[in-house]
Swiss-Prot record:
It comes from Saccharolobus islandicus (strain L.S.2.15 / Lassen #1) (Sulfolobus islandicus). It is an enzyme of class 4 (lyase). Pathway: Amino-acid biosynthesis; L-histidine biosynthesis; L-histidine from 5-phospho-alpha-D-ribose 1-diphosphate: step 6/9. InterPro entries: IGPD_sf, ImidazoleglycerolP_deHydtase, ImidazoleglycerP_deHydtase_CS, Ribosomal_Su5_D2-typ_SF. This is Imidazoleglycerol-phosphate dehydratase. GO terms for molecular function: imidazoleglycerol-phosphate dehydratase activity. GO terms for biological process: L-histidine biosynthetic process. It is found in: Cytoplasm. Keywords: Amino-acid biosynthesis, Cytoplasm, Histidine biosynthesis, Lyase. It catalyses: D-erythro-1-(imidazol-4-yl)glycerol 3-phosphate = 3-(imidazol-4-yl)-2-oxopropyl phosphate + H2O. Its EC number is 4.2.1.19.
Length: 193
């Protein structure tokens, strides 16, 4: 069974198109109006070992908020669809990733109970067109829509770029590991996820 998804989400504010294949490492194409966000999405999708296309159009370009939120929603929905009934997935994963002085822990459970707990000390208010207040919001929107319980904690660091990038790398690696097929069972005492 192919584990991929093609999701389009259009509102009065944005149009987001996401193609995601979680089992095939291939080309990654990302186009949003926020340069640093493009860099982080490419990082996330690369460390997920995926093939992906993300295209985001901001119809009402007030600021970066709508793009960040709507890409997170659409990407979350794509992961959820690609996983189907989640039969056989490892389900849990955690990663502790350094980037120079920054050290970030990501722990997740593909539980179908989407929520995020994010503890990052981001000193800069903006980086590459992205308001750093939208970083936790990205993770929250992604977690809610993907059905992933997500914890992200900064263990050390002071460089905003390094902290954010370590977070996206760790999330990508954790998602890759948690979505691997390890058997043919649903990993839950309930029998469903």
């Amino acid at each position: 069974m192919a584990r991929n998804a093609n999701i389009t989400r259009e509102t009065k504010e944005t149009k987001i198109e996401v193609f995601l294949d979680i089992d095939r490492k291939g080309e990654i194409k990302v186009s949003t109006p926020v340069p640093f966000f493009n860099h982080m999405l490419i990082t996330l999708l690369t460390y997920m070992n995926s093939t992906a296309t993300v295209s985001a159009t901001d119809k009402l370009p007030y600021d970066d908020h709508h793009i960040i939120e709507d890409v997170a929603i659409t990407l979350g929905l794509a992961i959820k669809e690609a996983l189907g009934d989640k039969r056989g997935i490892k389900r849990f994963s955690h990663q502790i990733i350094p980037m120079d002085e920054a050290l970030v822990l990501v722990s997740l459970d593909i539980s179908n109970r989407g929520m995020a707990f994010v503890s990052l000390n981001l000193k800069r208010s903006e980086i590459g067109g992205l308001a750093t207040e939208n970083i936790p919001h990205f993770f929250q929107s992604f977690a809610y829509n993907s059905g992933v319980t997500l914890h992200i904690s900064q263990l050390s660091g002071y460089n905003t770029h390094h902290i954010i990038e370590a977070s996206f790398k760790a999330l990508g690696l954790a998602l890759y590991e948690a979505t691997r097929i390890v058997d043919n069972e649903i990993r839950s005492t309930k029998g469903v996820i």
